[in-house]
């Protein structure tokens, strides 16, 4: 069996981890930092005889942010959380491959931090791969680094520190997984008269309302057919010239009205059955439940410590595994709920409701609370994303709007400037949960 062809793009991830030289000092967003007051974490690779940033290849099906925090812990022993993304490094390898390394600003986490407890245990890298780790000042690190790309990353970190942009907060918007497709109920889906029933379309027995019934006895060829009842009056009899009082309903008219009423009742019953099969607030589907467990790694990588959720079932249920294992608290926010039924008709004060959602998002942006998660469904999520873009830098505002898929997160990194919060970077990440119900596409073979 021939060996598989190597991938031309090798994806790796790492972090520039920094801390204050004074362990009692706390970072404040927007506060300029003297580079001499911080230290950066470096690793020595005996194979290349160089100092570099901790990084490594992403495992099969592993999100890049998960690979970044895992590789840093394997190579240095430090559990970290990720901040703003840095410039992606690309360089050629042997065999026609290209290595792409994604970097983030990283900060160490205390051992008792909830985000640290959610991480999978790792094995330290062998000494043949990493034999030394050290904390160094940026000035010393610049002399130790051998790769020009690594020095550019350090210069970016130092510039952020001097400008008060090194410490940032994070707002994460999550779109919960989808609900399962409701099974078709045989009773509610059974057609009436051999086809789907609807008001004014069919009646029991298969005769369509408004269509021509079977001509009765005495009907003239080509004349409109009118149902007759044995022993009843001739429906084709000529009307008297002089106006007369309206005649009493005939048995045929009574039967027709009863049939029409039966159709309306049956249609209403079918709508009730459909509403039961497709509830307005469906629970999280089976695949969405699996995604909720894999979300723990994504949320832990950014150090999420608190979450807000809309009252919908899926928005709450997707956070259940994360909260159950001690990830943090979940606060339900009624203002983020979507009215049941048609939104335009259910919420007559749509503008006021949209203003409440935007105000909630703006309040979260102004807070300096580490990483905050918003699990929201429906139109409220779109409003929050729009509000985040409104606070963005020129690069964020000019970029295409973010459209989230089920189980996907949007991560907004916020700097607290003199004029208020500014979103300086936006990234999206997805869980890599495999869905056995969806067939995978096989790559075509070339012969």
Feature-to-residue mapping (PLM):
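N-terminal strand-loop-strand
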Residues: 2-53, 172, 176
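Beta-strand elements within well-structured catalytic alpha/beta cores of enzymes
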Residues: 43, 169-175, 308, 368-384
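Active-site-proximal alpha-helix that buttresses catalytic centers in soluble enzyme cores
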Residues: 56, 67, 167-341, 400, ...
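Unchanged
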Residues: 58-149, 162
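Charged phosphate-binding loop/patch that engages nucleotide di/tri-phosphates or the phosphate backbone
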Residues: 150-168
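Domain-level recognition of soluble alpha/beta enzyme cores
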Residues: 392-422
